[in-house]
Amino acid sequence: MFDPETPPELTVSRWVNSREPLTLERLRGRVVVLLAFQMLCPGCMEHAIPQAKRLRARFNPAEVAIIGLHSVFEHHRVMTPEALEVFVSEFKLPFPVAIDEADGNAMPRTMAAYQMQGTPTLLIFDRAGRLRRHYFGQPDDIMLAAEIMALAIEETASPRDAAAVIERKLAAALNSEQHDHGQHHHHDHEHGDDCGCGHDHHHDHHHQHHAEPRGT
């Protein structure tokens, strides 16, 4: 069973636009924003990649790490590692990009481990390495930046109840009506005091690519 408190390490075949391989373990102490995308996904090109570039420009990389994950579950012959290198250079992606490792099934390993539904998917980890957000689709810029900043305020060893207080204050400050009509599917992995794992689901039907279940 997937546990956001101890999420699995990334399983990748290589890195592009990075001097050395990265791991979630090595990135602990920073907030990590991971964008899973495909080169031929319209939603990735129109929204997710430009958004990730804006986040990289606005946040201090010593505090917030932006990384990409090329998770190919379709058109494998076209979206090769060599094509990705050209893509990263041509579109001037300012962050490292990992290639999700294939395992013979349609869905690559990291994508399957995190139960992603397709691309674009955005995963946000706190300073302690816990998965705190899982977005499928197109989260709003302001909402996303506010959530990243809230996580950046937390200390690495921040108690869970202290983190929950910040989460509640953030939720109260955001316009919930606007939030509920956003173009995304959101899993909130914050564990509150009064429940298990809360899931606030918003379904996006605009431009994202859905992955087929493994083995199909």
Residue ranges and their predicted role:
Residues 1-25, 95:
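N-terminal "domain-start" segment that seeds a small globular fold
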Residues 28-30, 61, 93:
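Active-site acidic short loop of glycosyltransferases
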Residues 35, 65-68, 96-99:
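Structural recognition of the beta-strand scaffold that forms the well-ordered cores
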Residues 91-93, 101-147:
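Thiol/disulfide oxidoreductase modules built on the thioredoxin-like
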